[in-house]
């Protein structure tokens, strides 16, 4: 069954309800410029109450490997989601948590870059989002379907792919059936305002996403 990641959480209530509704992963954004930013200390207060079957994911932009490790330890993060193109392959080997590598995909994107990254780092779990200058997730912009097909085709046989960008409770089931991702990621698509989840939309999103079977599991 497809994995569901609810991202950009900043309140205990939203996190607990996401777990009750069936989310598999919860995302906490440590990028200070994001409207969904949460401090490591506040994230830790939420994460320590999560059930053991729900993974915590830290979203990072512009952080060095050592700082990522420190934040993950402080906030009790299971998985580091890395959006930073400046980290080299060697930097990824220094990271202690499990890793999801984010790729912002546009028309000029060379899908072979994903395989090269996997071969250099061993990281085999990815999140694909639509490219938007200076924005890292939560944009509400959908990834072109043809491009999405290409990236998911590229990782067949070695990778697990999450789809993000422009998903909501109305389009997620159709998207999952069409692209068959390992998982889906949503932030702005189920919000009443940045960082505040609309509970009815969140419940419906998770239910609709999980109607379709998908790849069995990495995380």
Swiss-Prot record:
Listed InterPro entries: Aldolase_TIM (IPR013785), PRAI_dom (IPR001240), RibuloseP-bd_barrel (IPR011060), TrpF_fam (IPR044643)
Pathway the protein contributes to: Amino-acid biosynthesis; L-tryptophan biosynthesis; L-tryptophan from chorismate: step 3/5
GO biological process, one term: L-tryptophan biosynthetic process
EC numbers for this chain: 5.3.1.24
Keyword vocabulary terms for this entry: Amino-acid biosynthesis, Aromatic amino acid biosynthesis, Isomerase, Tryptophan biosynthesis
Molecular-function GO terms, alphabetical: phosphoribosylanthranilate isomerase activity
Family, per entry: Belongs to the TrpF family.
Name of the protein: N-(5'-phosphoribosyl)anthranilate isomerase
């Amino acid at each position: 069954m497809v994995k569901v990641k609810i991202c950009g959480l900043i309140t205990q209530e939203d996190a607990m309800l996401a777990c009750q509704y069936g989310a598999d992963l919860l995302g906490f954004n440590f990028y200070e410029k994001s409207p969904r930013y949460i401090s490591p200390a506040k994230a830790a207060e939420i994460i320590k109450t999560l059930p053991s079957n729900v993974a915590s994911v830290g979203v990072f932009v512009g952080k060095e490997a050592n700082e990522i490790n420190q934040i993950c330890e402080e906030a009790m993060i299971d998985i580091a989601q890395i959006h930073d193109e400046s980290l080299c392959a060697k930097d990824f080997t220094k990271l202690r948590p499990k890793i999801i590598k984010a790729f912002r995909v546009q028309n000029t994107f060379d899908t072979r870059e994903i395989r090269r990254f996997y071969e250099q780092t061993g990281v085999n779990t990815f999140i694909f989002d639509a490219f938007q200058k200076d924005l890292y997730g939560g944009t509400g912009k959908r990834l072109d379907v043809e491009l999405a097909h290409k990236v998911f085709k590229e990782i067949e046989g070695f990778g697990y792919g999450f789809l993000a960008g422009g998903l909501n409770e109305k389009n997620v089931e159709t998207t999952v059936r069409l692209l068959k991702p390992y998982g889906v990621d949503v932030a702005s698509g189920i919000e009443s305002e940045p960082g505040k989840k609309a509970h009815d939309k969140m419940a419906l999103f998770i239910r609709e996403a999980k109607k379709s079977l998908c790849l069995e599991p990495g995380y």
